[in-house]
From Swiss-Prot:
Annotated GO MF terms: N-acetyl-gamma-glutamyl-phosphate reductase activity; NAD binding; NADP+ binding
Protein name: N-acetyl-gamma-glutamyl-phosphate reductase
Gene3D superfamilies given in the database record: Dihydrodipicolinate Reductase, domain 2 (3.30.360.10), NAD(P)-binding Rossmann-like Domain (3.40.50.720)
A Gene Ontology biological process term: L-arginine biosynthetic process
Keywords: Amino-acid biosynthesis, Arginine biosynthesis, Cytoplasm, NADP, Oxidoreductase
HAMAP family: ArgC_type1 (MF_00150)
Enzyme class: oxidoreductase
Subcellular location: Cytoplasm
One of the record's GO cellular component terms: cytoplasm
Family membership noted in the UniProt record: Belongs to the NAGSA dehydrogenase family. Type 1 subfamily.
Main location: cytoplasm
Organism of this sequence: Thermotoga maritima (strain ATCC 43589 / DSM 3109 / JCM 10099 / NBRC 100826 / MSB8)
Length: 339
């Protein structure tokens, strides 16, 4: 049985980890940490968790003694120093601190210096692309929600040189849970309801993460123009991607079917069928659709994920499974909630 701990257990991704791990047949929760609610039982704060473990302040000695794996569900910049204190525990960080190959890129976009970063062996935790590296990883940087939806939608096309990587346009829409549980006027019901708005235009922190991984896949420099939008729903991301091509839709579709034929969570839809966030709600599944705009030789790719599951906690559990030699679908086999 894998002994699992969670730091940041009372945020949305932390709570989702609790839900998934409580139902995992090969894992048990042995440590929960929260600065805000330390000393209280989790179910006192969130009755829906049915989890009576007492939340505590972060204690590296307790983690090392009681955990085989630690999930850090903290904002960017909060995990790095904590993780460096731990010995003998596998780390899966749901923040951005271990996603980048170049610490200079992290410094540029996140405004923090990561001392000694080059000495930490880490793997970017997108199983569909880095499964073999994840198997032997000690530290995994779990991908961001938007990058997960965009990278999986583009990977086959870039891998097989089916599209032009120089200018990739991404229009993405996310449910409000993607912003976390922080108190902010912008996320009040009366501000979000019956409204749709872009945010962090031309400066979203997930852009360099996308460009890093897409560049590895294509072997060329990749430029991503990314505009995210906040939509009045709780969960889900729908990314619509525009990229130039001189190939036929049939050829591209066949390449996607072949690329993902053995992937349990990625589903390439029949031509003419387009994904909906409703289809992956509460699950680790990804749905990808496509269409060709023949007048302009533009391939339009569409992907739908649940931002809290495949976009965060579900993918983290998938990584845990791989790191401990389990079937990666273990504890994640459930179908989406519908309607």
């Amino acid at each position: 049985m894998i002994r699992a701990g969670i730091i940041g257990a009372t945020g949305y991704t932390g709570l989702e980890l609790v839900r998934l791990l409580k139902n995992h047949p090969e894992a048990k929760i042995t440590y929960l940490s929260s600065r805000t609610y330390a000393g209280k039982k989790l179910e006192e704060i969130f009755p829906s968790t049915l989890e009576n473990s007492i939340l505590s302040e972060f204690d590296p000695e307790k983690v090392s003694k009681n955990c085989d794996v630690l999930f850090t569900a903290l904002p960017a910049g909060a995990s790095y120093d904590l993780v460096r204190e731990l010995k003998g525990v596998k780390i899966i960080d749901l923040g951005a601190d271990f996603r980048f190959d170049d610490p200079g890129v992290y410094r540029e976009w996140y405004g923090k210096e990561l001392s000694g970063y080059e000495n930490i062996k880490r793997v970017y935790g997108l199983p569909e692309l880095h499964r073999e590296e994840i198997k032997n990883a000690q530290v995994v940087g779990n991908p961001g929600c938007y990058p997960t939806s965009v990278i999986l939608a583009l990977a086959p096309a870039l891998k097989h040189n089916l599209v032009d990587p120089e200018t990739i346009l991404v229009d993405a829409k996310s449910g409000v849970s993607g912003a976390g549980r922080k108190e902010k006027v912008d996320y009040l019901f009366s501000e979000v309801n019956e409204s749709l708005r872009p945010y962090n235009v031309a400066k979203h922190r997930h852009v360099p993460e996308m460009e890093q991984e897409l560049g590895k896949i294509s072997g060329k420099k990749v430029n991503v123009v990314f505009t995210p939008h906040l939509v009045p729903m709780t969960r889900g991301i729908l990314s619509t991607i525009y990229v130039k091509t001189d190939k036929s839709l049939e050829e591209i579709h066949e390449a996607y079917l072949e690329f993902y034929k053995n992937e349990p969570f990625v589903h390439v839809l029949p031509m003419g069928i387009y994904p909906s966030t409703k289809w992956c709600y509460g699950s680790n599944h990804v749905f990808i659709g496509m269409q060709m705009e023949e007048r302009t030789n533009t391939l339009i790719l569409m992907s739908a994920i649940d931002n809290l599951v495949k976009g965060a906690s579900g993918q983290a559990v998938q990584n845990m499974n791989i790191m401990f030699g389990l079937d990666e679908t273990k504890g994640l086999e459930f179908t989406p909630i519908y309607p």
